[in-house]
Amino acid sequence: MALTDSLTYDTARVYGGSGVMQYYRDGAPTDLRTLASLMITDSDNTASLWLQELVGTGSYVNGVMERLGLRHTRVNSRAEGRRADWERYGWGQTTPREMTGLLVRMRNRELVDPASSDAMYRLLTHTYFTKYSLSELPPYVQVAAKQGMVNASRSELLLVNAPHGDYAYFIATKNNADTSWGYDNAAWVLQQAVARYLWAYFEPRSDWRPAPGAGRLLGGE
């Protein structure tokens, strides 16, 4: 398949939660690149499941992860033999080391081929979710990022193309006592604090700070 391949949306694919594709009208035209973009930038559940089906279910994705040497990164949803893991962990599971390593390999043009690595990396630099870790980084610094969130777990992967050199990290929480979805959720406050600390560590001469009122603009106080 090519990114430009045309597809037709069917409302039978609706999956609630995050994302805008669930609101498409029946029969709406789309394409593979739009699905990939929505999956990455908007964490679109409907688009993600459609893509998972197109590539050959979660079992195929897990085979790719195995070939990439990722022992712990797996899709549990709609994947043969993963039901117990799905009941325990949900859609998928990973580790900070494997997820960060995967993004670094993408940055270094080592996934699939250089052109594919670049295309994937570009998508990751256009996330919709800027009010978490990215709110503590200058908007003029490119960041490849992906967020994940369910009630009791919040995660965020970043590779920051900082002026004095790239740095990458992954932060994830589990069994959260605070399962709220407001701007001041404890896990998101932690993610912001980590982002702020790492920026100060790697760019100690930077005088950039979030602008007054930025929190209110993003839905905070």
Predicted regions and their residues:
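Short, well-structured active-site flanking segments
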Residues: M1-V14, G58, D113-S116
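Extracytoplasmic
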Residues: A2-T4, M65, L70, Y89, ...
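Active-site-proximal beta-strand/loop segments in catalytic clefts of secreted hydrolases
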Residues: T11-A12, I40-S43, L51-V55, S77-R78, ...
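Short linear capping/connector segments at secondary-structure termini
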Residues: A12, R78-D85, P139-Y140, A214
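Conserved catalytic neighborhood of penicillin-recognizing serine enzymes
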Residues: V14-W50, G58
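Mid-domain, small-residue-enriched loop/turn segments at the edges of structured enzyme/sensor domains
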Residues: A28, A36, L49-L103, R107
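Structured C-terminal helix/loop/strand segments within mature extracytoplasmic catalytic/sensor domains
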Residues: L54, G58, G101-K131, Y140-Q142, ...
